Amino acid sequence: MATTATPQLLGGSVPQQWQTCLLVLLPVLLVSYYLLTSRSRNRSRSGKLGGAPRLPPGPAQLPILGNLHLLGPLPHKNLRELARRYGPVMQLRLGTVPTVVVSSAEAAREVLKVHDVDCCSRPASPGPKRLSYDLKNVGFAPYGEYWREMRKLFALELLSMRRVKAACYAREQEMDRLVADLDRAAASKASIVLNDHVFALTDGIIGTVAFGNIYASKQFAHKERFQHVLDDAMDMMASFSAEDFFPNAAGRLADRLSGFLARRERIFNELDVFFEKVIDQHMDPARPVPDNGGDLVDVLINLCKEHDGTLRFTRDHVKAIVLDTFIGAIDTSSVTILWAMSELMRKPQVLRKAQAEVRAAVGDDKPRVNSEDAAKIPYLKMVVKETLRLHPPATLLVPRETMRDTTICGYDVPANTRVFVNAWAIGRDPASWPAPDEFNPDRFVGSDVDYYGSHFELIPFGAGRRICPGLTMGETNVTFTLANLLYCYDWALPGAMKPEDVSMEETGALTFHRKTPLVVVPTKYKNRRAA
């Protein structure tokens, strides 16, 4: 769904290991801070059009840290509280990095549409830069000719109808496995941790799309190790990097002293060894000719051999795009499915309404929902919309960076300013949504509001040039999975647990997920035919 989320960012206050580094580097950081603020004051005196700029309001800043201390473990919530005081366009300084946070639909429209071309580059964060093989993916590549070529390739090759059909096959195959597992659990009347089943499903879908049917077989000997390294990569990208907020020699030294650089290199090297093996296996002349044009790696290898445009495609491009696909798709789809099921377990009347729609549309005496049934379930799609409104997987959209001086809602924003869009705050803004904290899919009855980038009060996938390229595939995975969970089973909470007891506490960094597992009891739908 949403491509790679906010990198190395706001996942918490400054960790303990950095306190020693900051003390050791205090003199260097003080000098850097003085030089930076001196340059900022000089630029401010010159201003746009020869006058003083009208900068957005914001909280007072500490020396060195700027406003880093205000973020906390749930930055989207803290930033919403700050926006209530300072307004929907707010200026911060994160370390030495000038930053603007927008927290309303109108401000988001200015960033993502009106001034999209001014605000559509990406900051060169060191962690994502390394793991993307020097920004060779789509999610973190800076705006320019390279990014346009890559986006075109995505549209023509990776998101073509042939690829969509391959993804459909992967979904059907993995859903059969999930239903078989849940049938066994239902037969034993046991409670299950739904998280485990949902993550296995989404991992299987994306793995099959990327590497082919072998990913789900015992022949794929590297799967478990790859999953561990992938988890490490996602955790590392969400960790605090001093260089991300102090992009100078002092920040690099702090990362080196803390062990962050060594950890990043270890993860990168493990991923690289794995991807080299996968590419070599796909290029083996003895390998059978794949069906349906092959998997994602096959398509990318063919681009290496055949692409004659301005972009020279290499093995590093293959690795960067495959990693981008895994990081951007598995976690985001999984957390959306789990938040939807959590909300439905808290609202039994909504669960029954969605279930009745799915079962009426699909009919009785079927083993499960098929992909073509998705067009018949409009209310379930409202459930997905409402879930994404309340729980966007990336609460802060992937950061943008201004390419030139621009304005946002009348405020001057200099070039090279980092821009965050607080999608979580926008989805809960009472100016756009009555009873904004209530889960109520019926609010979309008769409404044309969607999440495809035209309605800025609902932007879990972003909008404009940088809208998530995998939106359609992610949306399909989520809707298809929820439809099957609701059709195939009745759901209950374990023991004497009541709907209001379902915890909605969240935690995370790259994506924000449930703090505790979702434990439920499935019962097989009595009118469903066995597979």
UniProtKB/Swiss-Prot annotation:
Coiled coil location: none
Chemical reaction(s) catalysed: (E)-4-hydroxyphenylacetaldehyde oxime + reduced [NADPH--hemoprotein reductase] + O2 = (S)-4-hydroxymandelonitrile + oxidized [NADPH--hemoprotein reductase] + 2 H2O + H(+); (E)-4-hydroxyphenylacetaldehyde oxime = (Z)-(4-hydroxyphenyl)acetaldehyde oxime; (Z)-(4-hydroxyphenyl)acetaldehyde oxime = 4-hydroxyphenylacetonitrile + H2O; 4-hydroxyphenylacetonitrile + reduced [NADPH--hemoprotein reductase] + O2 = (S)-4-hydroxymandelonitrile + oxidized [NADPH--hemoprotein reductase] + H2O + H(+)
Species, as recorded: Sorghum bicolor
Domain of life: Eukaryota
Localization in the cell: Endoplasmic reticulum membrane
Protein name: 4-hydroxyphenylacetaldehyde oxime monooxygenase
UniProt keyword annotation of Nucleotide-binding present: no
Physiological role: Cytochrome P450 involved in the biosynthesis of the cyanogenic glucoside dhurrin. Catalyzes the conversion of p-hydroxyphenylacetaldoxime to p-hydroxymandelonitrile via three different and successive activities: isomerization of the (E) isomer to the (Z) isomer of p-hydroxyphenylacetaldoxime, followed by dehydration of the oxime to the corresponding nitrile, and C-hydroxylation of the nitrile to produce p-hydroxymandelonitrile.
Transmembrane segments: 18-38
Enzyme's top EC category: oxidoreductase
Classification via PANTHER family: CYTOCHROME P450 71B11-RELATED, EUPATOLIDE SYNTHASE
Keywords: Endoplasmic reticulum, Heme, Iron, Membrane, Metal-binding, Monooxygenase, Oxidoreductase, Transmembrane, Transmembrane helix
GO MF annotations, alphabetized: 4-hydroxyphenylacetaldehyde oxime monooxygenase activity; heme binding; hydroxyphenylacetonitrile 2-monooxygenase activity; iron ion binding
Cofactor(s) this protein requires: heme b
